Structure formats: C-alpha cells, structure tokens
Regions:
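Outer-membrane beta-barrel transmembrane domain signature of Gram-negative proteins
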Residues: 1-11, 183, 203-208
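Composition- and surface-driven signal marking solvent-exposed, interaction-prone regions
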Residues: 37, 146-148, 158-161
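Transmembrane beta-barrel wall of Gram-negative outer-membrane proteins
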Residues: 2-29, 34-73, 129-136
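Transmembrane beta-barrel architecture of outer-membrane proteins
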Residues: 3-5, 28, 41-43, 124-128, ...
C-alpha cells in the first residue's frame, strides 16, 4: 500500500565532559488499504543536556505533524460486497458528471451516481517543550523540577453536499433566498427559504 518510513538519528555523546546533544527525525507515509485512507506523519525529537557533578539540566523538545484521510465511517456487508472491500464513503457527494462512480448506498437501498472529494482529512500539529533540572543532594535525596509547555493546532476538512449556509453563520442576505427587490422569499408556512450550497468546511481546535 505504498507504505514508507524514513528516520534519521544523531547523537553527540558526551562533549567536553559536560554536554550532550541528541536529535531524531522520522517520516511515515502510506496510501492505506481503504480507498482515500492515506496518511502522512512527521515527528522530531531534540534533546540537549548539561552535566556537572551532581547537577543535570536538560532541554527536550519533541512533536509531530499528522495528515490523515478520514476513513472511519465503516461499511455494511452489502456495501463491501457490491462496492468492494476497500469502499470508503467519506467525501462522497451526488453528481451526474461523466467522471462519476456508480455505487450501492445501503442507507437508501439504491444505486447512486456519486463522486468523492479526495482531500477530506484530519490535520494536527503538536509541539512539546520540557526543561528538566535534577540536583543530587545526598546519597538518599535528589531534587527534580520540570517546566513544560505544550502547543497543539489542528483541523479536519470535509466536503458538505447541499449544506444550509445559515448553519455556517453566513449573513442573512447570503444565507436565505431573496427576490429581485431584496426581500426574503418564504415558504407556505412563512419561513424563510435557506440557500443551499456545496462547500468545504474546516473545523479548528487549539490547545495550550
């Protein structure tokens, strides 16, 4: 499934009787077994240390970035039998163009002409930094202290078919249908008629 892993690791050993430096960089990528189920992962580690008698001071930084296609919707037995065992419904939308696919939709119980958005992904970056101090006070006692900071940022990207624009906080004059005079169009119950569009959304998160 075109899976590849590369890693580089360097280590200085003890330099000048006091200093050490270690670093590692890793990359993993795969197309995955499930269609549009690929992944791309990178990670790093850096560590610098100072040693002097009973004192140790160490700076550690590690983290990584992940981009993973969404492929955890699952599939029914009929969908796998008729669409193949690698079937993935993620990113599917209805279409009638010449490049569409004919698939079995078990939820509706019928064949449909659909296409797939290939970049429906989960994306996340995290960085961890640590400063570690260790002081040996005696044969029985050691004092240790650690300061740390973690930062994370991520989002998932999805194709939404026939989405209502007001659900995404579009202003009313864009989210609801209007006539030539700019008045809102209403249905038989007097409710404004929502504008629907195909769109790509990104839902974000950050953590500290």
């Amino acid at each position: 499934y075109n899976t590849n892993k590369q890693a580089v690791h360097v280590s200085s050993g003890l330099m000048g009787g006091h200093w050490t430096v270690d670093a590692r960089l890793t990359r993993l990528s795969s197309d995955g077994y499930i269609r549009r189920g690929g992944t791309s992962l990178t990670s790093y580690m850096f560590q610098g240390g100072y040693y002097n008698g009973n004192t140790m001071l160490k700076l550690v930084s590690f983290g990584g970035k992940a981009k993973t296609n969404l492929s955890y919707n699952g599939a029914t037995r009929d969908e796998m039998r008729l669409n193949g065992r690698r079937y993935n419904s993620s990113g599917m939308y209805s279409t009638s163009d010449a490049y569409s696919h004919r698939i079995w939709n078990s939820e509706d119980g019928e064949w449909q002409q659909v296409n797939f958005y290939d970049d429906e992904t989960d994306n996340y970056l995290q960085i961890n930094n640590q400063l570690i101090l260790s002081q040996r006070l005696s044969d029985r006692w050691t004092l240790s202290a650690t300061a740390f900071y973690t930062y994370g940022y991520g989002y998932y990207k999805q194709y939404k078919d026939d989405a209502k624009l007001f659900e995404y906080l579009f202003p009313d004059h864009l989210a609801y249908q209007t006539d030539d005079q700019g008045n809102f169009v209403t249905d038989g119950d007097g409710e404004r008629i929502a504008v629907r569009r195909d769109l790509i959304r990104e839902k974000l998160m950050r953590n500290h």
